[in-house]
Design a protein with these regions (language model features):
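Catalytic beta/alpha-barrel core
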Residues: 116-120, 169-176, 181-189, 220, ...
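Alpha-helical scaffolding segments of alpha/beta enzyme cores, especially the outer helices
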Residues: 96, 100, 188-202, 226-230, ...
Length: 345
């Protein structure tokens, strides 16, 4: 239905993409990508080097994802080691407990889309398999737990290790980053974030960047928006963000504006828990319920740390641990859905 001149422009542009990207038909541009190129052009003769266009290609060809995620996070390592040490349990039992957490999450999900888990590979290998059996959305950490400056679980090439991970697993990277950190620290952390971003894009994997700023400086209305803008400014566009609860609507509005302005294809923001009491989490859900870019939550220790302590100490059974975690997770799911429903009313 297009004029001949437009059809020729489409054909020539598609040919230029296919030749530049070397893989022919798999690299033909999507229609949004084609429109972006024809509207904006490119400063690169080799179109494969244009990161803005490459991002549109990635975002319009990546696998579909649920529009929102409610996740039980059990990727904690040093925290559960501390609990095991406290009650005199061997670290090996942490792996068994994480399998119980999958059972709890699967019970609450009950086969529905939009439920997920954060699970590590160190203690959660079997749990990762079980989560896949239940078709839960899964994010898996790549960072060395607790590291600041950011470091990774694996030495050498990140890509060499990440290529072994199932493609359905979202690669999650936690960075303790405050915009007022010393410049040397900030630049080092940014280099590491760029490494994992490059590895994810090269391998075709979703990347979730988790930012925790409040542990290393004041959490003001502009703190997280400044971090987000800086990460976008250095060319990193994660598929997901995971952020700590904000103290004001102003902060959430600034976060929403920054993400929307810099990456309209971002899948969204997930709110983390930081072991907050249940009532505090409910309030944090209400605070961000009407923010368009916020798409879910990921809460861990509020759900599992007390059952973990009791189970590792031999005070409760497997079934009791699953029941307790499922009850807490279900309560948070209800709080989240109620907050969203109330805001939409």
């Amino acid at each position: 239905d297009e004029p001949l001149e437009t059809c020729c422009a489409y054909a020539n542009a598609c040919g230029a993409f296919a030749v530049s990207r070397l893989l022919c038909s798999p690299e033909i541009p999507t229609f949004p990508e084609l429109q972006f190129f024809l509207a904006n052009g490119s400063p690169h003769h080799a179109l494969r080097q244009d990161q803005a266009i490459n991002h549109v290609h990635w975002a319009t060809t990546r696998p579909a994802s649920p529009p929102g995620i409610m996740a039980l996070a059990i990727d904690h390592r040093i925290q559960l080691e501390a609990v095991a040490r406290e009650v005199g349990a061997p670290f090996e039992r942490i792996s068994d407990f994480k399998v119980l957490a999958v059972q709890a999450a699967a019970r609450v999900a009950d086969g529905r889309q939009g439920f997920g888990m954060f699970i590590d590979g160190r203690y959660g290998r079997e749990a990762l398999f079980r989560a896949a059996d239940h078709k839960l959305w899964v994010a898996r950490p790549v960072e060395l737990t607790g590291s600041r400056p950011l470091d990774f679980e694996y030495g050498g090439s990140l890509g060499t290790h990440l290529i072994e991970w199932p493609t359905a697993q979202v690669i999650k990277c936690l960075c303790f980053y405050h915009p007022d950190d010393p410049e040397e620290l900030r630049l080092r952390q940014e280099r590491e974030l760029a490494r994992v971003y490059d590895a994810c894009r090269t391998l075709g994997r979703d990347l979730l960047i988790e930012i925790i700023a409040g542990k290393h400086g004041p959490l003001l209305d502009d703190t997280i928006p400044r971090v987000i803008q800086r990460i976008y400014d250095i060319g990193i566009k994660p598929d997901w963000w995971k952020l700590e609860p904000q103290k004001s609507a102003t902060a959430w509005e600034a976060i929403n504006e920054s993400v929307a302005r810099n990456d309209s294809y971002c899948r969204g923001v997930m709110v983390l828990g930081l072991e907050a009491p249940f009532a505090d989490l409910v309030e944090s859900f209400r605070a961000c319920a009407g923010v368009p870019v916020v798409k879910g939550f990921a809460v861990g220790r509020t759900i599992h740390i007390d059952p973990a302590r009791a189970w590792l100490a031999g005070k409760i059974s497997d079934a009791e641990a699953v029941d307790q975690m499922a009850e807490r997770f279900a309560s948070l799911v209800s709080a989240w859905t109620d907050a969203r429903r109330a805001k939409a009313a």
